[in-house]
Amino acid sequence: MNKRKIELIIAFLIIIIVTISLFIIFKKDSQDFVYKGEKGEYKFDIQQIGTVTFYRPHVFVGGKEYIYAFRNKPQNLEELPLESGILNKLNRQGGLKELYITKDVNLSSQIEGNVNIVTAPMASILGKTDFGIYRIRVNSAYTSFHAGEPVAPTVDCSTVNYNGKVNKTVGVVYLKLGNDNKIYSEGDCIIIEGKDSDGLIKAGEKFAYHLIGVF
């Protein structure tokens, strides 16, 4: 094979590599989108892990970028009811010190073990990890005594609504199954309700989107 043919083959391979690279970049960019939310525009990128698609909003707070992962894009949650001003239920005069995300003992079995999928976005945003914006101590709890592992406290809406008075340092988010997919409150207790596993995940993510200002 002469030198000219080798040069042509190399040039052809370079063209193929560049074309494939541009296609991959274009495909990725074409999947990104900007969503006009309640508090501004949010850039989203899309990530595929196995069979699961994640929608990842980019949030900037105090000059720092936070990226979260959701299973539902905001366009698909717009009609899900969210009580107006519900974040006020987490306001405390001296600052909220602790938040319990509580659920009935049998909830995990009722929603196919997907409790962590429901809570992951909101816990990441609220918590004290590097991903947390609110920097609140977030704990898992049950509404009645739970003898299994790990040991968890017993917390329900009465924990925050005690004799008509609001607990001055603690907040409660109660996950439950019900007749609708929605986010509402009873007193100062925030309730995230879903008709089934999928509905509860959607309601949980709608609340998490609300925490970062998308809704």
Regions found by a protein language model. Give the residues of each.
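Long, low-hydrophobicity ectodomains and other hydrophilic envelope-associated domains
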Residues: 32-35, 42-215
